[in-house]
């Protein structure tokens, strides 16, 4: 039984890793553009993601206030996604922000941006605002 449990755990771990993805700069820029993000703002979005999650869909971060940030955009569970903790304004389970399909992540990030602009993200405020942004023009 112990061997079976170990094998099962290994299979589950492989599957969980298979769902996670680290995007490249251009791959992310194209995904954002294909989901309605204006090309003029792509450098800001790419910079945000680079500094929030290092382009990883599986990124999580526990905050001092007890909340958690999820996924490539580091979307917080106190307001935006459902983990049994907060208001879930994006109407999405936080765990769905950790897979390699970022369509729903982008939809939620657009809502956050609509309400608060890029200032909703400390990664953008601290590393992108007023600074040299990534060039994504060669991606298209």
Swiss-Prot record:
Recorded catalytic activity of this chain's protein: Hydrolysis of (1->4)-beta-linkages between N-acetylmuramic acid and N-acetyl-D-glucosamine residues in a peptidoglycan and between N-acetyl-D-glucosamine residues in chitodextrins
Known EC number: 3.2.1.17
Keywords: Antimicrobial, Bacteriolytic enzyme, Disulfide bond, Glycosidase, Hydrolase, Signal
Stored Pfam families: Lys
Disulfide-bonded cysteines: 26-139, 47-128, 81-94, 90-108
GO biological process, one term: killing of cells of another organism
Keyword Disulfide bond annotated: yes
Annotated tissue distribution: Expressed in salivary glands and Malpighian tubules.
Domain C-type lysozyme: 21-140
Active site, UniProt feature: 52, 69
Domain of life per record: Eukaryota
SMART domains for this protein: LYZ1
Induction annotation: By bacterial infection, expression significantly increases 6-12 hours post challenge with bacteria.
InterPro entries per the UniProt record, alphabetical: Glyco_hydro_22, Glyco_hydro_22_CS, Glyco_hydro_22_lys, Lysozyme-like_dom_sf
Molecular functions per Gene Ontology: lysozyme activity
Keyword Signal in annotation: yes
Annotated signal peptide: 1-20
Similarity comment: family membership: Belongs to the glycosyl hydrolase 22 family.
Function, as annotated: Lysozymes have primarily a bacteriolytic function; those in tissues and body fluids are associated with the monocyte-macrophage system and enhance the activity of immunoagents.
Name this polypeptide is given: Lysozyme c-1
Native source species: Anopheles gambiae (African malaria mosquito)
